[in-house]
């Protein structure tokens, strides 16, 4: 357990013990301790920690909050802790002040744990699956896919850091109507490029990339599929194009630093009979009925506005039917928790999917769906809607070519998924402190530069400073930097519990800012050995923490810039 979390847990435990002692002494009356908050005050003059326990006990204890706070402080045992003072503030908050020397333990902790610093055991080894991107394999990755990639991969890394066993998954939509339309589109382009005057199907895929795919195919097979059975031709065209598109998707995501443990085929659910079996199970449970020749799921039971068709009149399952089967399959694979990242336009699908899982006997609370809002690209102060290269939507590949992988990932992960991302292309390329990813990476490069200079001057850059040396770190800039470093394990735990990796982007920006303030006010390589050793330990710890958090976010930590 980290030093920071240990201190926090100690205060929690001592508060609970004080309340029980007061109850035993007849000074406080309550049935059970209510949920209360222990957090760092926004104003530094209010101490290191503050709790609202006295205020939330008022209703049960039938006393004024400040009177309850006085009683709690009276029974608070702080011996053997870092607590040096307990004070009542405002309407009844209790503020705690800690011995400043508690921070001396932070640097040895970081330097001993290295890449493991920040790890917590919130998940206790539970199996979590994160499914994200899952783009249609009929085209190229767009901005919505890009945001989902950054969010999903960072969330998976965060959960792994928090003690979960995590599996990343991409669901391949290689079945259903969209693949049929894809086949018709490919066939039309093939025949057109072979000189035949055929119409393009209504609702077909018009992308230039599809034409490029067919041109590449013709270079390999020529007119071999011109005068063959239509079904054979379509089957070949789809198989060829899907393989090419999926290869492109894999390569683009790999270049973004995103890797998957499983690529799961929708078609495999149909081929194995699992979709049919799932619909039969729902029918046996009384959740499916027939109307107008089709089979309908009673999704209104789950809060939907209307029931949904799951099997069409011609006997073919809908995409929703396959999706229900897919989610059943996830739970059958033994995942304790399943997380999906979807575009906000799928919000109407959430209640019915959770309801379907409930109907199949699974706890819907174990299915979490995170909805993402749109991405707007901005250049020269204006919204960019089309690619200059293709005249169509801008692809993830084009974005990375323009601003690089690191800027793409950081800009997408900075915002809460529920907020629209305004991606400023000019800012993402700027080499200035206004560019958040540059600001953070520059901090890491500057830390590396200090350590190189120290090594060149023959100073020790490998050992762990002694406690007496670390007590020399007394400036405000040093203390604030140490406190921020100490917070990382707690920040990991909170971000993982809330499934909010964007909190870590905020954390690393704050850490970089505190380091830059320290750098501008304190010289590291001073003549006094004890102070120099302590500051070098602080530099190494800051560098390690920056690298750890950037690693979760999938952003490189450069040694030189």
Curated annotation (Swiss-Prot):
The keyword Transmembrane helix does not apply. The keyword Metal-binding does not apply. Signal peptide: none annotated. It is found in: Cytoplasm. One of its GO terms (cellular component) is cytoplasm. PROSITE patterns: AA_TRNA_LIGASE_I (PS00178). Pfam families: Arg_tRNA_synt_N, DALR_1, tRNA-synt_1d. It comes from the Bacteria. It is an enzyme of class 6 (ligase). It catalyses: tRNA(Arg) + L-arginine + ATP = L-arginyl-tRNA(Arg) + AMP + diphosphate. Monomer. This is Arginine--tRNA ligase.
């Amino acid at each position: 357990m980290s030093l920071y979390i240990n201190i926090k847990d100690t205060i929690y435990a001592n508060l609970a013990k004080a309340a029980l002692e007061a109850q035993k002494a007849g000074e406080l009356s309550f049935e059970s301790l209510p949920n209360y908050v222990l957090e760092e005050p926004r104003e530094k003059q209010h101490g290191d920690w503050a709790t609202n326990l006295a205020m939330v006990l008022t209703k049960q204890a039938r006393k004024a909050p400040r009177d309850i706070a006085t009683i709690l402080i009276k029974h608070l045992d702080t011996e053997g802790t870092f607590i040096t003072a307990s004070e009542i503030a405002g309407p009844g908050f209790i503020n705690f002040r800690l011995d400043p020397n508690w921070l001396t333990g932070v640097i040895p902790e970081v330097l001993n744990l290295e890449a493991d610093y920040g790890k917590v055991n919130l998940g206790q080894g539970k199996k979590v699956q994160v499914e994200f991107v899952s783009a249609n394999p009929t085209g190229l990755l767009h901005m919505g896919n890009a945001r989902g990639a950054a969010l999903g991969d960072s969330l998976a890394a965060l959960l792994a850091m928090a003690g979960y066993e995590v599996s990343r998954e991409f669901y391949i939509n290689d079945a259903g109507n969209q693949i049929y339309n894809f086949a018709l589109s490919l066939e039309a382009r093939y025949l057109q490029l072979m000189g035949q005057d055929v119409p393009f199907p209504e609702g077909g895929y018009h992308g230039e990339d599809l034409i490029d795919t067919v041109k590449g195919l013709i270079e390999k097979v020529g007119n071999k599929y011109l005068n063959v059975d239509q079904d054979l031709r379509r089957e070949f065209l789809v198989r060829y194009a899907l393989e090419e598109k999926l290869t492109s998707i894999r390569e683009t995501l790999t270049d973004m630093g995103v890797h998957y443990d499983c690529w799961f085929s929708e078609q495999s659910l149909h081929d194995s009979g699992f979709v049919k079996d799932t619909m039969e199970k729902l029918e046996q449970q009384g959740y499916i009925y027939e109307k107008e020749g089709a089979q309908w799921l009673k999704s209104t039971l789950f809060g939907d506005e209307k029931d949904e068709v799951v099997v069409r009149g011609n006997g073919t399952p809908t995409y929703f039917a396959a999706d229900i089967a897919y989610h059943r399959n996830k739970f059958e694979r033994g995942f304790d928790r399943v997380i999906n990242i979807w575009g906000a336009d799928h919000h109407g699908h959430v209640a019915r999917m959770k309801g379907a899982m409930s109907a199949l006997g699974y706890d819907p609370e174990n299915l979490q769906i995170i909805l993402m809002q749109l991405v707007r690209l901005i250049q020269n102060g204006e919204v960019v809607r089309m690619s200059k290269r293709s005249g169509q939507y801008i692809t993830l590949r084009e974005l990375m070519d323009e601003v690089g992988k690191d800027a793409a990932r950081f800009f997408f992960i900075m915002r809460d998924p529920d907020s629209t991302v305004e991606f400023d292309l000019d800012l993402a390329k700027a080499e200035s402190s206004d560019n958040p990813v540059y600001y953070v990476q520059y901090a890491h490069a500057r830390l590396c530069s200090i350590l190189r200079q120290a090594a060149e001057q023959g100073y020790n850059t490998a050992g762990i400073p002694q406690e007496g040396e670390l007590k020399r770190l007394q400036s405000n800039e040093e203390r604030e930097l140490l406190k921020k470093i100490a917070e990382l394990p707690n920040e990991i735990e909170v971000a993982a519990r809330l499934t909010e990796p964007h909190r870590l982007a905020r954390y690393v920006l704050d850490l970089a800012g505190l380091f830059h303030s320290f750098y501008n006010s304190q010289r590291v390589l001073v003549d006094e050995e004890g102070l120099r050793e302590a500051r070098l330990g602080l530099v190494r710890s800051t560098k390690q923490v920056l690298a750890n958090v950037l690693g979760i976010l999938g952003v490189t930590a450069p040694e030189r810039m």
